[in-house]
UniProtKB/Swiss-Prot annotation:
It comes from Sputnik virophage. The lineage of its organism: Viruses, Varidnaviria, Bamfordvirae, Preplasmiviricota, Maveriviricetes. It comes from the Viruses. This is Uncharacterized protein V2.
Amino acid sequence: MRGVKIPELSKIMRELKTKELKKLLRYELDESTSVDSDEEQDDPGVPFYYEELEKCKTMKELYKFAREYDLQIPRIDKNDIFLKACKELNKNNIFDPNEDIIFEGVIIDPVVIG
């Protein structure tokens, strides 16, 4: 069985996963800092949290941020990230429809990617 290995896929997946985690943590911050209309907001540092979040560039930094500010770390669907990365790569028609794709030892049919 023939297949093609795509090293760029891991890099793109890492970037997408980082972007997705940052988005989910931003949502988590929105939820944890939202205030009922009856309450006054005691914490003037809410924009500070968002600034700190934007400074995070890696998954490690994002996980550290989440632990530091006691945020729930959301689960990211690896399959969803994988398909997004493949579609991103396929914009350049990198996949040959006649060859399987091998990623982390798994063989994927290019038809699945679309």
